[in-house]
Swiss-Prot record:
PROSITE patterns recorded: ARID, HMG_BOX_2
Name used for this protein in its record: High mobility group B protein 9
Residues covered by the ARID domain: 38-129
Coiled coil residues, start to end: none
Single GO cellular component term: nucleus
Gene Ontology biological process: karyogamy; polar nucleus fusion; regulation of DNA-templated transcription
Chain's gene name: HMGB9
Amino acid sequence: MSSDNESTPSQATVEMMATSPAKIKEYPEPLALHEVVVKDSSVFWDTLRRFHSIMSTKFMIPVIGGKELDLHVLYVEVTRRGGYEKVVVEKKWREVGGVFRFSATTTSASFVLRKHYLNLLFHYEQVHLFTARGPLLHPIATFHANPSTSKEMALVEYTPPSIRYHNTHPPSQGSSSFTAIGTIEGKFDCGYLVKVKLGSEILNGVLYHSAQPGPSSSPTAVLNNAVVPYVETGRRRRRLGKRRRSRRREDPNYPKPNRSGYNFFFAEKHCKLKSLYPNKEREFTKLIGESWSNLSTEERMVYQDIGLKDKERYQRELNEYRETLRLRDGDMTNGKAF
């Protein structure tokens, strides 16, 4: 870590969370070395979630153009250019956005990337890149959010499909694809529940993960990055309510999610440290992160192989689970037919 980087936080102003000094919110200790979180995405995601939990701040994965934004790539690209402040001053957000190769229909990508970085990664950057201590820092490069987009968390392409509407919601004539900005209201196995503002009208809808079309699929069968409008009837509302509740929590047969190699290493080391130092649990994450960074390539491969096998196990069990559901749904459909 260069000495130039370490001096940057001193340029920022202290952000007071309350008038009383006792209520000033302060930065925690780094959860891992910056070099480690840059090289290992699993360490990055683990420490980022823990960081937001410690800071009691909201954490979510933004969606741009119908795809989840890779915050690890965003963090790497911004920090290797000197951090948030430097990217803003040197106007390099368009350059950062070019790494993601957003679709041609995605607009305001630089604006959205900057906003998400400020909300989700700025304080994480201060702690892990610049090793900031004490009260929270506020960037000098002030972010002026457009009032019309200050609460928006997703950039999606809206393609009005040919669907059946109630009399109160007639289909629009001459509809075509265009880009709109909206908010993510919830997430489920197949996609996201979103809210999109089109002019003065606000539409609720479902943003599905686009599937790969088969040979027999018609052009209208797959709507990439499409927001499907819906009318909230009582029956529809109940069905969506069930989807919002995680199937993982409800169904005991749902396969156990896979863990990365670092997760296995973390669990192993955490167990050992807890038995040796039961009163120093707050320091374990940092110690384990340093231990992981000190492993040789061969030693690290042992855990990464375990993680790869666990990923294969999860994918195999997930395919079996989905096949079981498909057969069960098919049996139920056939039973209703008779």
